[in-house]
Amino acid sequence: MALRGSHRLEVIFKRCIASPVFHSHAANRRSSQLAIKGTDPSSNGNSGQDQQNGEQKAKGWRRLVRFFVPFSLGAAVSAAVIKREDFTPTIAASKMTGRRRDFNFIADVVAGCADSVVYIEIKDTRHFDYFSGQPITASNGSGFIIEQNGLILTNAHVVINKPHTMVQVRLSDGRTFPATIEDVDQTSDLATLRIQVNNLSVMRLGKSSTLRSGEWVVALGSPLALSNTVTAGVISSTQRASQELGLRNRDINYLQTDAAITFGNSGGPLVNLDGEAIGVNSMKVTAGISFAIPIDYVKVFLERAAEKRKKGSAYKTGYPVKRYMGITMLTLTPDILFELKSRSQNMPSHLTHGVLVWKVIVGSPAHSGGLQPGDIVTHINKKEIKNSSDVYDALADNSKNLDIVILRGVKQMHVTITPEDP
């Protein structure tokens, strides 16, 4: 390949030499050099020595081309990367031809609904960044606009994390606004926010009842705080009961998808190929297993919230009486354990129960104590943990510290956490 590339470069260089422009400049340079030396450029008194010198120069040019041009190309590529904002693609889909036009259906979906997706940050008003002096980001998530006057839908666990926080929303165009919480249903894990701005792009709501397993879907959001991220997959199941996931007090049949969803995607939309939201991204168990709240269930929540607004009953910030640890967790049911063991060789074969930690709030007691996403809690204060209810019961206990036994991969570890009082 290297020889073939060098040969092509030589051909290109020879063509350049053959061009009139090259010869005109070359002739001018030769005339100038000969004039300086006091030699007549039209003289034909050159000998065989001159011909030999010309051949040596030609060989030198070839070596120079082989060495210099690849580095020139590399420099050009580097310059293109550095100045990539100057070359943002602006080709409309209607101007594309061939397969790009016929098969890029995911791009068509994104073009129609991405502007309505927002990035949500939860700021801790008690802790400030050393350099900027601004409140630090305690956690983040996603949401999407459902009314032009600034009403935003998201997950309750995104905005209800702990006391002494404020909510900020960043739109797809980069504008940032403070947000107020309008309504929260912690049982269904849904919430609405309001920002004071009008004429916003709105996400259309579809019907989750018409979904079929195997349908293409697109997940939009801000995983790991990376705004405007797009992933795609299919609906794995339309009827994944909350009891199968070990979620207490929830009577929801979740949508299961293999679209990549991770931390920060929570609250973002799961969209069908018509550009309609058919679910709200809620949780991830492992790669290829994620869940979303069906949009039909969300519509019931929105109707109730609208009735409350008509009656003038505003949402009052209320935090759980239980102590705060700072994790989002999922009960390991037999079905989920089977999926995890089939996908990962690091899962202990003897594991039959526990709670999976899939998110840890930065700066929380769990974070300070060393708990990490992916840890599996099996015991707290020597009591066996079989589901998330057992963890809540442990938090309700008056013990100052929680001695937690976890599985991290195949290793069993102990971490000590001191929950915050409400």
UniProtKB/Swiss-Prot annotation:
GO BP annotations listed: apoptotic process; ectopic germ cell programmed cell death; mitochondrion organization; positive regulation of apoptotic process; proteolysis; spermatogenesis
Annotated spans, Disordered: 29-56
Gene Ontology cellular component annotations, sorted alphabetically: cytosol; mitochondrial intermembrane space; mitochondrial membrane; Nebenkern
Location of the region described as Serine protease in the Swiss-Prot/TrEMBL record: 139-302
CDD domains: cpPDZ_HtrA-like
Entry membrane topology: Single-pass membrane protein
Assembly and interaction partners: Interacts with th/DIAP1 (via BIR 2 domain).
Function: Serine protease that shows proteolytic activity against a non-specific substrate beta-casein. Promotes or induces cell death either by direct binding to and inhibition of BIRC proteins (also called inhibitor of apoptosis proteins, IAPs), leading to an increase in caspase activity, or by a BIRC inhibition-independent, caspase-independent and serine protease activity-dependent mechanism. Can antagonize antiapoptotic activity of th/Diap1 by directly inducing the degradation of th/Diap1.
Propeptide: 18-74
Protein name in UniProt: Serine protease HTRA2, mitochondrial
Record's subcellular location: Mitochondrion intermembrane space; Mitochondrion membrane
